[in-house]
């Protein structure tokens, strides 16, 4: 029986490239001259450092523009609160969402069941497995999910025939 998985994960290689490009632009921009503005990446979180709130906003704008150019959906980012660190400097931790949350997976299963398409949806950890008799049914489920779930970027992978 054909099946596929619905997941929510960013392309970490492109995220890393966007961060490196952001740091390169920040180091060469005139308005950041002499400041300690930078972006760091550790596993599933990004930390933005700057001298004040205004420059932190500019650092985030640079990061978001570089991510958009590299086709990384910015809906993967979950912003933490702005923290003050030594002196006048500030930082903000930005978490990268990974996996389909419990509420979203229940919503996906409910949408699939309410659609009356002859497929089954089951929650498997941080992914939702959709299984059906025909490939056409699976393609119509993908189209329906892309239309109805707009708050989180979904990826469809692990296709089996």
Swiss-Prot record:
Molecular function terms from GO: nucleotide binding
GO CC aspect terms: cytosol
Keyword Nucleotide-binding assigned: yes
Database matches in InterPro entries: DUF520, UPF0234_N, YajQ-like_sf
Cross-referenced CDD domains: YajQ_like (cd11740)
SUPFAM superfamilies assigned: YajQ-like (SSF89963)
Reported function: Nucleotide-binding protein.
Family indicated by similarity: Belongs to the YajQ family.
PANTHER family: UPF0234 PROTEIN YAJQ (PTHR30476:SF0)
Name of the protein this chain belongs to: Nucleotide-binding protein Bxeno_A3642
Lineage: Bacteria, Pseudomonadati, Pseudomonadota, Betaproteobacteria, Burkholderiales
């Amino acid at each position: 029986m054909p099946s596929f998985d619905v997941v929510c994960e960013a392309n970490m290689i492109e995220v890393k490239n966007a961060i490196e490009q952001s740091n390169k632009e920040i180091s060469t921009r005139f308005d950041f001259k002499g400041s300690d503005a930078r972006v760091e990446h550790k596993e599933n979180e990004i930390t933005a450092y700057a001298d004040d709130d205004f420059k932190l906003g500019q650092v985030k704008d640079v990061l978001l523009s570089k991510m958009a150019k590299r086709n990384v959906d910015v809906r993967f980012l979950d912003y933490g609160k702005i923290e003050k660190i030594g002196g006048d400097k500030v930082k903000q931790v930005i978490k990268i969402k990974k996996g389909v949350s419990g509420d979203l997976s229940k919503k996906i299963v409910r949408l699939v069941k309410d659609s009356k398409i002859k497929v089954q949806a089951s929650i498997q950890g941080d992914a939702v497995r959709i299984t059906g008799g025909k490939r056409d049914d699976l393609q119509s489920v993908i189209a329906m999910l892309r239309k109805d779930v707009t708050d989180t970027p979904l990826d469809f992978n692990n296709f089996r025939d």
